[in-house]
Amino acid sequence: MRIILLGAPGAGKGTQAQFIMEKYGIPQISTGDMLRAAIKAGTELGKQAKAVIDAGQLVSDEIILGLIKERIAQEDCAKGFLLDGFPRTIPQADGLKEMGVAVDYVIEFDVADDVIVERMAGRRAHLPSGRTYHVVYNPPKVEGKDDVTGEDLVVRDDDKEETVRARLGVYHSQTAPLIEYYGKEAAEGNTKYLKFDGTKQVAQVSADIEKALA
């Protein structure tokens, strides 16, 4: 079962990725993790990537696709894998296709921008412990204070409204066209496209996914 997850930052992809991995016993392939592992291992692609990163450049699609090809050839991917955060652009999706990587399911989590902003902007964090709260969905016992230590909670830079809206802008310009791309692929019978309402309760979304993949 080879799966690609699509959805804006804050749409709940990470939570559902965890569910899919555990339920179906397939690994999640994160391009960031792959890059770090290849650089640490000193592989040929890792050396190329390190040189590019050290020069302050973006790693090319060619290197990323090469890393994916190596990763999915490993034994733990025999039953399938989950791609999260890749492809982000049409050329990357074309690259996967040209490599002969068949995708069984493309899963999109649909959440309106304003809902995502509310979700992210309402987050509060206790940085020393990593504990997180939400002013609406998971509030601390005392407003603005960590439940365990009583220390102040903060809004991480990543969760500030202007940062969230900027990231959403990048998503809509770069990644949203993939929705149309994979819609066409599904119409041609090359993959199955599944769309879920990401505003539902986490357990309900998981149940909907399980039913659709059965």
Curated annotation (Swiss-Prot):
Q: Which GO terms describe its molecular function?
A: adenylate kinase activity; ATP binding
Region (NMP) spans which residues?
A: 30-59
Question: Where is ATP annotated to bind?
Answer: 10-15, 123, 132-133, 200
One GO term of the biological process aspect? AMP salvage
Q: Where does AMP bind?
A: 31, 36, 57-59, 85-88, 92, 156, 167
Q: Which UniProt keywords apply?
A: ATP-binding, Cytoplasm, Kinase, Nucleotide biosynthesis, Nucleotide-binding, Transferase
EC annotation from Swiss-Prot or TrEMBL: 2.7.4.3
Q: Which PROSITE patterns match?
A: ADENYLATE_KINASE
The record's section on InterPro entries has:
Adenyl_kin_sub, Adenylat/UMP-CMP_kin, Adenylat_kinase_CS, Adenylate_kinase_lid-dom, P-loop_NTPase
Compartment list:
Cytoplasm
Pathway(s) annotated for this protein in UniProt: Purine metabolism; AMP biosynthesis via salvage pathway; AMP from ADP: step 1/1
Q: Does the keyword Protein biosynthesis apply?
A: no
In residue numbers, the region (LID) covers 122-159
Q: Which Pfam families match?
A: ADK, ADK_lid
Q: Name one GO cellular component term.
A: cytoplasm
Family matches, as CDD domains: ADK
Write out the catalysed reaction.
AMP + ATP = 2 ADP
Q: According to its UniProt entry, what is the function of this protein? A: Catalyzes the reversible transfer of the terminal phosphate group between ATP and AMP. Plays an important role in cellular energy homeostasis and in adenine nucleotide metabolism.
Domain notes, please? Consists of three domains, a large central CORE domain and two small peripheral domains, NMPbind and LID, which undergo movements during catalysis. The LID domain closes over the site of phosphoryl transfer upon ATP binding. Assembling and dissambling the active center during each catalytic cycle provides an effective means to prevent ATP hydrolysis.
Family affiliation: Belongs to the adenylate kinase family.
Q: What is this protein called?
A: Adenylate kinase
Which gene is transcribed and translated to give this protein? adk
